[in-house]
Every structure is written in C-alpha cells, then in structure tokens.
C-alpha cells in the first residue's frame, strides 16, 4: 500500500515538474519579429562589422523589447521593402522611410518617430548654388537619387517630368555620390544626415544651404496588420515619453 501511494506521489511530482518546465520554456522563448531595411543610409542604418546598426535598428530593438518580441533584421534592396512588407515577407520596415500618400495605399504606417530633410550635394565648384538653380526654366542638369526613394519621386516630378533635366536612379546613396565624384552627374538629392556622412568621406563635395523638402519618417507594416501597428505605436509613445528614443537619435545626431 505504502509503495503504491509513493508511486502516485512521485508520478504527480514528475508531472508537476514537467509542467513547470514547459511553462518556463514558454516564458523564456519569445516570438521574433523581422524588420527589413536597406543598410546604406547612415546614421539611420548602416553596416558596422557584420552588424546592421544605426538609429532605426536601435529604435526597433527598444520597441520590440517593450512589446515582448525578439528582433531579426534583414538588409535588402530599398525598392523591395514596400512590396516585401505588404506581402507579409517581413513584419515591418524601418529604413528612413518617408510617409507619403502613395505609400499609404500599399502599407500602414506607425506614428512618426523622426523628421528628415532632403538636401542637395554638389561639387565645391558646381554652378548649382541653390534649389532654385536646379529647378529654373532652362536648367538641364543630371540629378542622382536612390531608386524608389522620395528624393527620386520628387526629382522626377520637379525636374525630369518638367523638362528641366534628367534624373539618374541608383541602387543606393553611395553609388549616387560616387557618380557625382566621378563627374557622371551634376548633383545628388538625398536626406541630410546621410548627406553629411557622404560629404565627410569624399573631399570636394558640399551640401547646399537651401533645403529641398522636409518629410516624416515612420515604420511601415502590411495594411491588415492593425494589431501590430497599435502595439508598435503604444511602445513608441512610451519610449518617447521616457526619453529612450530621443536619446537614441541624439546619440547619432547630436543637437547643434
């Protein structure tokens, strides 16, 4: 009788131990969210060693931690980001992505977390001294941009479609800047922060004082993924209020 009771006690104890182990394993394992980006846009995203680093990866990591997810980052071509997240290939995109009405037709955006400024890079001796020179009647410059970016979209509308020059699209900002250095194009339209990095790395270039356009950056998601957008926005709001996100941006873009 005592042996039977002891066996039952041991069986119950073993079952309880296995159950607790299972619960612990569930508690330790987190669902992973995949963020797609194009890591040629410093300081928002760039490659350092074998890691994708920058403002967007750090904000994404903080937001995912707040939501209770692990984060995986995929570096891919910029012009495949919208279609990739829209099809469900990625959970979300952060890539210095500007909110536009056209993109809103394809994806959902989070709340804005940063503001970008489009500027113009030229050679030191360039005849282009302002945005007005580039957009003047009779102007006939070749303008470099990164393909599928808002810089490309604006330049096509303002310059090529208006008969004021030609727009050359490149896979990334670095290739556009190298084309400028090598005399193949007359200027590059790109966001201000990566522009600073490219000018610092290439002697003989400068950024024009006049701003081309100001725009908002946000993360984007598949149109029907409203639950994740809401969670992301809630975490974003908390991390902005407690100073985490401003500190990340300040780390890479110190206030002047």
Where are these regions (language model features)?
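Periplasmic-binding protein-like
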Residues: 39, 115-124, 192, 196-236, ...
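Alpha-to-beta junction loops
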Residues: 69-70, 86-95, 139-142, 172, ...
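Short helix-initiation/N-cap motifs at beta->coil->alpha
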Residues: 57, 72-85, 129, 167-182, ...
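Short, low-complexity disordered leader/linker segments with a strong preference
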Residues: 1-33, 256
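A ligand-binding cleft/hinge motif common to bilobed small-molecule-binding domains
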Residues: 79-80, 97-105, 153-157, 179-182, ...
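Flexible hinge/capping segments at coil-to-helix
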Residues: 122-142
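Ligand-binding clefts/hinges and TM-proximal coupling segments of bilobed small-molecule sensing domains
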Residues: 70-72, 150-168, 200-209, 234-256
């Amino acid at each position: 009788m005592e042996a039977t009771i002891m066996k039952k006690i041991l069986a119950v104890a073993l079952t309880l131990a296995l159950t607790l182990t299972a619960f612990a394993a569930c508690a330790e394992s987190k669902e992973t969210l995949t963020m797609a980006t194009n890591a040629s846009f410093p300081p928002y995203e760039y490659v350092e060693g074998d890691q994708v680093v920058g403002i967007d990866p750090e904000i994404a990591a903080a937001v995912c931690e707040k939501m209770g997810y692990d984060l995986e980052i995929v570096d891919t071509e910029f012009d495949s980001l919208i279609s990739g997240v829209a099809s469900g290939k990625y959970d979300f995109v952060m890539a210095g992505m500007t909110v536009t009405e056209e993109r809103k037709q394809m994806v959902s955006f989070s709340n804005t977390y940063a503001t970008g400024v489009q500027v113009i890079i030229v050679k030191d001796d360039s005849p282009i001294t302002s945005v007005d020179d580039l957009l003047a009647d009779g102007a006939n410059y070749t303008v470099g941009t990164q393909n599928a970016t808002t810089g490309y979209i604006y330049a096509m509308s303002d310059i090529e479609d208006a008969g004021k020059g030609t727009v050359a699209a490149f896979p990334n900002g670095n290739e556009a800047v190298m084309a400028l250095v090598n005399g193949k194009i007359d200027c590059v339209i790109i966001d201000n922060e990566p522009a600073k990095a490219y000018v610092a790395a290439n002697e003989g270039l400068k950024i024009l004082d006049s701003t081309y356009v100001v725009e908002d950056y946000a993360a984007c998601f598949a149109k029907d993924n409203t639950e994740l957008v809401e969670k992301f926005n809630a975490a974003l709001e908390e991390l902005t209020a407690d100073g985490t996100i401003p500190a990340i941006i300040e780390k890479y873009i110190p206030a002047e």
